[in-house]
UniProtKB/Swiss-Prot annotation:
The keyword Zinc does not apply. The keyword Cell membrane does not apply. Substrate binds at residues 11-12, 25, 33-35, 122-126. Residues 1-175 form the Macro domain. This is O-acetyl-ADP-ribose deacetylase.
Amino acid sequence: MAVQPEVILGDITTLEVDVIVNAANPSLLGGGGVDGAIHRAAGPALLAACKQVLQQQGECPPGHAVITIAGDLPASAVIHTVGPVWHGGDRMEAQTLADAYKNSLQLAAANNYRSIAFPAISTGVYGYPKEEAAEIAVRTVTAFLTRYNPLERVLFVCFDEETAAIYRRLLASYP
């Protein structure tokens, strides 16, 4: 794995990377948490692009990902992925969350992007336990980078120090 994912504490909407990942809801029309923050920072162009995707493709199912323009964000594009709602772990949540990361990475690579920033998908209002979600994120991203690595920079952007510490500890256990 040539690229070692980085952990940063901060605001994903301010990052100068090729693509940021939005922890979206199926409608793609904005909501709370990081989804709302991205929509507010990106302005009306992002909402219009999401409405167009919704009109053409319908809602985005959990585990899937779609790409749009970034509007007023410094990033070039936004990949919207829908993570699972936590129901105790017995409804394929782990696989759906892994798919959200994997499909986002594949979409970034398919569009020739070199840098990507992820929030902690599903750990806000969707209630996924932070530790378990981080384990899935780190495992999925590092496996992708080991097998297929068109990316030069991968960031895990954490909203709080507790989450950042979890990611740092998990990444330290990977070569």
